[in-house]
A protein has these predicted regions:
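Residue-level detector of high-confidence beta-strand sites
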Residues: 103, 115-119, 181, 243, ...
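Extreme N-terminal starter segment of soluble prokaryotic enzymes
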Residues: 1-5
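Short beta-strand scaffold segments in enzyme catalytic cores
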Residues: 80-82, 102-106, 147-149, 231-233, ...
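Active-site catalytic loop in hydrolytic enzyme cores
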Residues: 89-174, 187-196, 200, 267-270
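Short polar catalytic/cofactor-binding loops
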Residues: 8-14
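CN hydrolase (nitrilase-like) catalytic-core segments centered on the catalytic cysteine
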Residues: 59-79, 156, 161, 165-250
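Cys-nucleophile CN-hydrolase/nitrilase-fold catalytic domain and related Cys-dependent amidase chemistry
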Residues: 15, 23-110, 116-118, 125, ...
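A conserved C-terminal secondary-structure "cap"
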Residues: 260-279
Length: 279
């Protein structure tokens, strides 16, 4: 058994302030004994793409340096939410004005980036509450699904980002024991779907789900964009083990039992009953 923590934070367009707050919340989680701590989507910056280009770089560059240092010092695993990755072109250069990737990473207790994943599904939606989202105008989609990552925690971890949550085939293909969903889910869609989708992915895959989240307003004041909040952790039976609720920043912590995975999969062996010859 080990403890996992999901961070709930309110990111703005001041990257330095966001990083300081993220490290503070990571410290709180580690102080409570969490060995796996997840940051939300876009923890480092929420704002115009032109601002992201000022600091975006490769995933193993400066953006995650302090998070990696934290992991090494505190001997914890970290789901690094998502950052603005600027892909490198010929000669290590990036074309000016090129789109970024919305990239998550898993960092080991040695401070090593053991896996990274570029968000596949981009959120281009007009919300009935009046908010308009066109992620593809700023972000390029990834082109490869993530693989399950073996860890010293006794579970295989799978990576995804926010809107990926609506595509169940992605999680079935990963085949992980613990599914990570760092998010900035909208308040309008989150109220109806956030918990339902997280629980569904947990039940379908008989896996734990770790879902860090943004809280409050996301984006400029003149844009009607609010995050749903409710960072949470769900068990393989679909029970919500911890929920951060709304409005406030903070962390939630819950135990992850590898034995619980085995029990659920033994008692209801749905994964063994898949008709791979047909589907």
């Amino acid at each position: 058994m080990f403890l996992a923590a999901a961070v709930q934070m309110r990111s703005g367009n001041d990257r330095a302030a966001n990083e300081a707050r993220a490290l503070e919340l990571l410290g709180q989680a580690a102080g409570r004994g969490a060995l796996l701590i997840g940051l939300p989507e876009m923890w480092e910056h929420i704002g115009p793409a032109r601002e992201k280009h000022a600091f975006a770089g490769p995933v193993d560059g400066a953006q995650l340096a302090r998070i990696r240092e934290f992991c090494s010092k505190r001997a914890v695993w970290c789901l690094a939410g998502s950052i603005a990755e600027l892909a490198q072109g010929p000669g290590g250069r990036s074309a000016e004005g090129s789109r970024i990737y919305n990239t998550t990473a898993l960092i080991s207790p040695r401070g090593e980036i053991v896996a990274a994943y570029r968000k596949l599904h981009l959120f281009d939606v007009d919300i009935p509450d009046g908010a308009r989202y066109r992620e593809s105008e700023q972000v390029a989609p990834g082109d490869a699904p993530p693989a399950a990552i073996e860890t010293s925690l006794g579970v295989k971890i799978g990576l995804s980002v926010c809107y990926d949550l609506r595509f169940p085939e992605l999680y079935r293909q990963i085949g992980a024991d613990l599914l990570c969903v760092p998010a900035a889910f909208t308040a309008y869609t989150g109220k109806a779907h956030w918990e339902v989708l997280l629980r569904a992915r947990a039940i379908e895959n008989q896996a734990y789900v770790l879902a860090p989240a943004q809280v409050g307003r996301i984006g400029p004041a003149n844009e009607n964009r609010f995050a749903w909040e409710h960072a949470c952790i769900v068990d393989p039976w679909g029970d919500v083990l911890a929920d951060a609720g709304g409005e406030q920043e903070g962390i939630v912590v819950a135990p992850i039992h590898p034995a619980r995975l085995s029990q659920v999969r033994r008692d209801l062996p749905a994964l063994q009953h898949r008709r791979r010859d047909v589907l």
